[in-house]
Amino acid sequence: MGRSRSRSSSRSKHAKSGKHNKKRSRSREKERVRKRSKSRESKRNRRRESRSRSRSNTASRRERERAASPPDRIDIFGRTVSKRSSLDEKQKREDEEKKAEYERQRRIRQQEIEEKLIEEETARRVEELVAKRVEEELEKRKDEIEREVLRRVEEAKRIMEKQLLEELERQRQAELAAQKAREEEERAKREELERILEENNRKIADAQAKLAEEQLKIVEEQRKIHEERMKLEQERQRQQKEEQKIILGKGKSRPKLSFSLKSPD
């Protein structure tokens, strides 16, 4: 099935290549015909220039003849009376020259028309002959062209497969590199988070240690204050007892009273 598709595609390619070859052959033949047409056109232009020069030479010759001829005599009625026969012959000769020139121009135009028709017919026949020969040559080389087309198709397939595999390998390498970069980025983020957590834990531990130390200081201060209060209370009670003893006369001599406050450490 694939073989038939490849053959049909090769035939279509073969037909296309045959058309391109025909077009190139036709274009080359048209170029040659165009060059021949230009050559003939230049020849016709040279002929026209030659005719125009001959006409100008004839006119100048006639002017010189008129200037060289003696003036005719004129009668009382204003008519020329001398050399009438020579003038008639001259006029007749001029008419014959005009007719001959006209006939020559007509033949030249006829020849140009015939040459153009021959040129067109030749170009048409050459084009048909070239197309026929190209078609015959393509038909002869049909199998060879098909084999060459199949070879090029297989080569193109191998090249495309190789390029596809290379592209897939490049994509795989790119994906691996991207994955590695993502893993490195995630690892760096984890390390940064761990460092931040460790720093925070250290700060919390330092803060807790400072807080515990402050609490110990506060407890120690409270203990000292409590001890001082107890001492003051004991001293106050002792003094009250002594005052009561004095008041009640239990003692023989009145003791000296002393009050002292200890400053907290």
Curated annotation (Swiss-Prot):
GO molecular function terms noted in the UniProt entry: pre-mRNA binding; transcription coactivator activity
Region listing for Disordered, in residue ranges: 1-106, 229-265
GO cellular component term, pick one: chromosome
UniProt short sequence motif LXXLL motif 1, positions renumbered to this chain: 164-168
Subcellular location: Nucleus; Nucleus speckle; Chromosome
Name of one Pfam family that matches: ARGLU
Bias-annotated ranges (Basic and acidic residues): 60-76, 85-106, 229-245
Region (Necessary and sufficient for transcriptional regulation) location: 67-265
Domain of life: Eukaryota
Placement of sequence motif LXXLL motif 2: 193-197
Segments passing through the bilayer: none
Assigned keywords, A-Z: Chromosome, mRNA processing, mRNA splicing, Nucleus, RNA-binding
Location of the region described as Necessary and sufficient for RNA binding in the Swiss-Prot/TrEMBL record: 1-66
BP GO terms, sorted: mRNA processing; regulation of alternative mRNA splicing, via spliceosome; RNA splicing
Compositional bias per record (Basic residues), positions renumbered to this chain: 1-54
Functional note: Dual function regulator of gene expression; regulator of transcription and modulator of alternative splicing. General coactivator of nuclear receptor-induced gene expression.
Free-text note on domains in this protein's UniProt record: The N-terminal region can bind RNA; preferentially binds 5'-CGG[AG]GG-3' motifs.
Similarity comment: Belongs to the ARGLU1 family.
Protein name: Arginine and glutamate-rich protein 1
Gene behind this protein: arglu1
